[in-house]
Amino acid sequence: MNSDLTSFDKIEQKIGGSRKTSNYIIGGMLTIGGIGFLLASISSYTGKDLLPLGNPSTLLFIPQGIIMGAYGVVANLLNFYLWYMVYINFGSGSNSFNKSSKSVEIKRKGLFKDIDVKLNFDEIKSVKLDISEGFNPRRRIALVLKGRKKPLPLSGAGELKPLLQVEEEGARLAKFLNVNLEGLK
């Protein structure tokens, strides 16, 4: 929940997607590495140096050139996938809570189609804080719905906010929705 636009009867939260600095850095590294491996493979096949560094034309095509070509193809496939995710801003969206109409609208950008979930306040049982520390920490806010076992996450994937900020956002949302707050120990 990157930004909150709060009024007395409405809360709007913008969710960031895959347009993160880390994805740009990894995408750039994959692009350079994938093209480099493909050029090294082609250089070993043709006997001409296509790279400014090193001397890949001296490599044997079998097995080094073929393996480098395979690495290049795999890297470029991952590279195209990652750049496509960045282009469509996968996972971005918004959460909208409207007290006057007693409705919740959750929108996310999907791979092939957008996700749009509309709920009434009556369907919400509580707001849950899902906090786990350790090797792969997770701090997210979710809605527990009546008749559904799994909570509906509201936070964006990969967001790691300070614990105090997550607790404050969860408490403010629970108070706004007039439901209980779960997950605090």
Curated annotation (Swiss-Prot):
Record GO biological process: photosynthesis
Membrane-crossing ranges are 24-44, 66-86
**UniProt-listed InterPro entries:** PSI_Ycf4_assembly
> Which locations, inside or outside the cell, does it occupy?
Cellular thylakoid membrane
Q: How does it sit in the membrane?
A: Multi-pass membrane protein
Q: Which GO terms describe its cellular component?
A: photosystem I; plasma membrane-derived thylakoid membrane
Q: Which residues form a coiled coil?
A: none
At the top level of its lineage, which domain of life is listed?
A: Bacteria
Keywords annotated in UniProt:
Membrane, Photosynthesis, Thylakoid, Transmembrane, Transmembrane helix
Summarize the protein's role: Seems to be required for the assembly of the photosystem I complex.
Q: Which family does it belong to?
A: Belongs to the Ycf4 family.
Protein name according to UniProt: Photosystem I assembly protein Ycf4
* UniProt organism field: Prochlorococcus marinus (strain MIT 9312)
Organism ancestry: Bacteria, Bacillati, Cyanobacteriota, Cyanophyceae, Synechococcales
